[in-house]
Structures are given as structure tokens and as C-alpha cells.
């Protein structure tokens, strides 16, 4: 039986690897983009480039371009200005979907009720906003896998991990 997933991503180099790995184990129903690692337009471009370059049949949905509250901080010093180590990539020929990521998450949770898994490798803004728009979503999602939090030391501050730090209200 196939496993169905959405990847919620702030597409930098680490997330492109996550997309490729996940595509081998899940039927990816979408990549939802959220503000995180680098400039938002670069995150969108990186997701589209990854899908196109590796010939993945996965729609890309644009989500929240800022945290729920507070100031958005990026980490170009970690991922390069474009999010993938300043590797020069071509402009993607494909475009993102017109449907907003939050609406896509809610819709897909209904279409794949009890089967949908969320692979959140980014700040949790899109997921929090989807929940605020439709609190019943939690009953329809099978699992949420989160790349976030810190057990002992953070990667952004001594105690905070980036994905939770950039939008703590969403986490």
C-alpha cells in the first residue's frame, strides 16, 4: 500500500535531499513552501528546480512568506545566498500551483483522510495556519514528521533549533 505525503519545506540544500529521499518512499502529493532558510523567492525557485531537474511529478504550492509573529531571519551564511551553496541553477520552466499551500494541505487531508503524512522539514508556519483555518485537520492526518527542536544544544542559539526558533508561535 502506498504512503502519501506532503513535504513542507523552506527549500535549501538539506530540503532538496529530503525531497529526493522522500520521493523513493512516499507518493508525494505536494511540496509546500514556507519562509525559512533563505529569501522566499529562492526557496520557491529551488523547489521548482528540484522537481524539474529530477523529473518528479510533484506540484509545488506557495505558502506563508513570513512567520506568524515576529521578524523573519534567514541563514544564508549556512546555505549560501540562493539556498543551495550558491550553485548556479537555471530558471525552472515549470510554475507553482495557484492554490495556496494552506488550502492544499487542508484539501489533501480530506482527499487522503487517515493516510496523509506531513514531512515538515521547515518552520511549522503553514501547518499552524492550516490548523487555525481548519482545526479538524488533526483528525485527518496520519502522522506529522518534524525536523525541529533541540535535545541539548541548538543550531541557532545555545538552546534553539532554527525551524522552531524562526517561528516559535507556529511550533
From Swiss-Prot:
Concerning SUPFAM superfamilies, the annotation shows: Nucleoside hydrolase
Query: Which Pfam families does this UniProt record tie to the protein?
Result: IU_nuc_hydro (PF01156)
One Gene Ontology term of the molecular function aspect: hydrolase activity, hydrolyzing N-glycosyl compounds
Domain of life, per UniProt, equals: Archaea
Q: PROSITE patterns from the entry?
A: IUNH
Keywords noted in UniProt:
Glycosidase, Hydrolase
Q: Which family does it belong to?
A: Belongs to the IUNH family.
Protein known as: Uncharacterized protein in bps2 5'region
Give the organism, scientific name.
Acidianus ambivalens (Desulfurolobus ambivalens)
Q: What is the lineage of its organism?
A: Archaea, Thermoproteota, Thermoprotei, Sulfolobales, Sulfolobaceae
Amino acid at each position: 500500500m502506498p504512503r502519501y505525503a506532503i513535504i513542507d519545506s523552506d527549500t535549501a540544500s538539506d530540503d532538496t535531499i529530503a525531497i529526493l529521499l522522500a520521493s523513493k518512499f512516499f507518493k508525494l502529493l505536494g511540496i509546500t513552501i514556507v519562509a525559512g532558510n533563505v529569501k522566499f523567492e529562492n526557496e520557491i525557485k529551488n523547489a521548482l528546480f528540484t522537481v524539474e531537474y529530477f523529473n518528479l511529478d510533484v506540484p509545488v504550492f506557495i505558502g506563508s512568506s513570513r512567520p506568524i509573529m515576529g521578524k523573519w531571519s534567514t541563514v544564508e551564511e549556512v546555505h549560501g545566498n540562493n539556498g543551495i551553496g550558491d550553485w548556479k541553477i537555471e530558471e525552472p520552466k515549470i510554475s507553482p500551483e495557484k492554490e495556496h499551500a494552506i488550502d492544499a494541505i487542508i484539501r489533501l487531508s480530506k482527499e487522503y483522510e487517515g493516510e496523509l503524512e506531513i514531512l515538515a522539514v521547515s518552520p511549522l508556519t503553514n501547518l499552524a495556519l492550516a490548523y487555525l483555518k481548519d482545526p479538524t485537520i488533526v483528525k485527518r492526518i496520519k502522522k506529522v514528521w518534524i525536523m525541529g527542536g533541540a535535545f541539548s544544544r541548538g543550531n541557532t542559539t545555545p538552546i534553539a533549533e532554527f525551524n522552531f526558533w524562526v517561528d516559535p508561535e507556529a511550533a
